[in-house]
Regions:
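Class I S-adenosyl-L-methionine
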Residues: 211-213, 218-269
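A short glycine-rich, Lys/Arg-flanked "PGG" loop and its adjoining helix->strand segment in the class I
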Residues: 180-194
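Conserved glycine-rich SAM-binding loop
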Residues: 54
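Conserved beta-strand signature within the Rossmann-like core of class I S-adenosyl-L-methionine
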Residues: 195-202
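S-adenosyl-L-methionine
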Residues: 1-49, 57-65, 94-154
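Conserved SAM-binding loop
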Residues: 90
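Conserved SAM/SAH-binding beta-strand->alpha-helix loop
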Residues: 83
């Protein structure tokens, strides 16, 4: 997705506890990054990641969903993208969710000619957001999926990956770029732990069917699949969380396009 450079992004990311730069050494260190205290129990936490999070609608909604679900009380979330402007938008989206404010309210904070600001109370809330406890369970990472295994290891307890509406790369010469391609799946298995789940959604039927073959070839089992996500109650129940409709998904649904989805679990027996 093409997106214009935004002047405010660099400073906002640099000063946010949410943001982890691609230059940081994170492999097998996410427990320390999240400051997880599990009383010496090595595996008493899980990390779920979304690769290609875009503007952050999914991870911010997932964060709120997990916060209200005891099943995910020890689960931490990382949204990943390689485009700095996207990371900036995702940062604001997450902050807005935590503060329970709209994008429009956030944008109402305007610096006036005399140097003062409109909506001072909200401005102070935003400035102090790094001190909110909720921030302890979510991060955004600037990273390229091509070397995703550089940022995660087995000690990080990454048990689930979300892949939502990633580029289908339909031309044969580009298919290795797919986030579901076998080369990527092998990289994910370098660090996936526990159940080793991948939740995959796309509007592209051919991309979905070819991806099913990739998963099968590497040794993943299909826990459940659907070609009509919105109307498949069995799938939604199996997923364990409500379906979070992103901007892409809404656009496709408005056009009458069915959503394909699958939960794939690695069979290492």
């Amino acid at each position: 997705m093409r997106i214009r450079r935004k002047k405010w992004v660099e400073d906002e990311l640099k000063n946010s506890v949410l943001y982890i730069d691609r230059t940081e050494d994170t492999k097998n260190k996410w427990k320390n990054i999240f400051d997880i205290d599990n009383n010496g129990n090595k595996n008493d936490f899980e990390i779920h990641i979304e690769i290609g999070m875009g503007k952050g609608k999914f991870v911010s909604s997932l964060f709120k969903e997990y916060a209200n679900n005891k099943r995910y009380s020890n689960t931490y979330i990382i949204g990943i993208d390689m485009i700095e402007a996207m990371l900036g938008l995702a940062k604001r989206e997450i902050e807005n969710r935590i503060l329970d404010i709209s994008k429009e309210e956030r944008e109402s904070i305007i610096k006036k000619r005399d140097g003062s600001y409109t909506n001072i109370e909200l401005k102070e809330k935003v400035e102090n957001i790094n001190n909110i406890d909720n921030f302890k369970k979510i991060r955004i990472l600037n990273a390229n999926a091509e070397n995703i295994d550089k940022y995660f290891g087995k000690e990080d307890n990454v048990t689930r990956i979300y892949l939502n509406f990633s580029n289908p790369w339909p031309k044969d010469k580009h298919k290795k770029r797919r986030l579901t391609h076998m080369t990527k799946l092998k990289k994910y298995l370098e660090f996936l732990s526990g159940k080793k789940e991948i939740y995959f959604k796309t509007d592209d039927y051919n991309f979905f069917e070819e991806s099913r073959e990739y998963f099968k070839e590497i040794g993943f089992k299909e826990e459940i699949i659907t070609h009509n996500l919105q109307n498949d109650d069995i799938y939604l129940k199996k997923a364990g969380i409500k379906n979070i409709i992103t901007e892409h998904e809404k656009m496709f649904l408005d056009k009458g396009i069915f959503i394909n989805a699958g939960i794939f679990v690695y069979n290492n027996k």
